[in-house]
Design a protein with these regions (language model features):
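The feature marks proteins involved in alpha-glucan
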Residues: 1-90
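Substrate-binding/active-site clefts of carbohydrate-active enzymes
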Residues: 67-241
């Protein structure tokens, strides 16, 4: 079934609802359809042997946005990888490619950085992956799927997974441990796959029927619910592993 796209038709209280799979690990462009994936087929060469560098000395952490990190033409990155996951595989880049002032991971090495913290790289809802766009990514849509706008091919669900693995592998090879910024306290909108699959279970609702909005994003995930907590823990473990 690898590469097959699918969604669910759910009968809930007499209503037929179409939804993507909230547990999916791959999806199509813009995250509207889930994709069955054999994760072994997304492994770059040497992935099974890849390990993070050993923790040594002081932790010097550099937080970055995947697109911003390599988007500017002055960075000296090949055009087809600018703003994409594969940019992290480009070592020894320099300003305008002139070889004088380091950019990218070469610049991070010069700073003495040993941890790279990636701003959200799961699939989020505010950027049209078929066009050029920008957002920080704090609006999750598919929690267990990499963001497609950072991929060189957002239309084929396996590509974004492989390219993110390659990026992490390249960062490890260059001496960086990787931290992933995650957002489990709210979703892109209340019209989420979690809501469609089990209405009002995954969101915190007050006794008067109003939706909790402590996140100031229009909704709060109900992490106190047993299956919601399980979902979050399984998602974190999936990314970590």
């Amino acid at each position: 079934l690898h590469g097959v796209y699918y969604d669910f038709l759910l009968d809930i209280e007499g209503e037929r609802i179409q939804s993507a799979d909230p547990y999916a690990r791959a999806c199509g462009v813009n995250g509207t359809r889930s994709m069955a994936v054999d994760l072994r087929k997304t492994d770059p060469e040497g992935w099974e042997e890849d390990v993070a560098p050993q923790k040594e000395g002081e932790q010097i952490i550099y937080e970055l946005h995947v697109k911003e990190f390599s988007w500017d033409v002055s960075g000296g990155f090949p055009e087809h990888v600018r703003g994409k996951y594969p940019a992290f595989c480009c070592e020894n880049t320099s300003l305008y490619g002139e070889g004088t002032y380091p950019t990218g991971t070469a610049y991070l090495k010069q700073l003495g950085v040993n941890y790279v913290q990636l701003m959200p790289v799961y699939d989020y809802g505010s950027v049209d992956e078929t066009k050029d766009g920008f957002n920080w990514g704090y609006d999750p849509m598919n929690y267990n799927v990499p963001e497609g706008s950072y991929s060189t091919d957002p239309f084929h669900g396996e590509v974004r997974i492989r390219e993110l693995k390659e990026a992490i592998q390249a960062l490890h090879r260059q001496g960086f441990r990787v931290i992933m910024d995650v957002v489990y306290n709210h979703t892109y909108s209340l019209d989420s796959w979690l809501q469609k699959t089990m209405p009002w279970y995954f969101y915190r609702v007050w006794e008067d029927g109003s939706v909790s909005n402590g996140s100031a994003c229009g909704n709060d995930v109900a992490s106190e619910q047993a299956m919601c907590a399980k979902y979050i823990l399984e998602s974190v473990l999936y990314w970590a592993e």
